[in-house]
């Protein structure tokens, strides 16, 4: 009987990179195709759980009553998207993350393991 490998859940937070309004049509097409290829491969390998870009508008809330403390409109360090993946361990999740197309445009990936609850 084969031993079942338990996969762990990881969150990838995408920040920065070129703003789409600063890209040429060719850059936008290449970037889009790179993302679709990468995500398609993750889906094929059953590693992609969910992932979406985020809209530009948003608010940072704080305190007991959720007071508005910030807007994201001009913040270049704002999270622009996220992805949830499954991997055997942190090393595999890191390897997967290193293939992210955001690096081609100067962006970053924050990789976090989800805690068991």
Regions found by a protein language model. Give the residues of each.
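Conserved, structured core segments of small domains
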Residues: 1-117
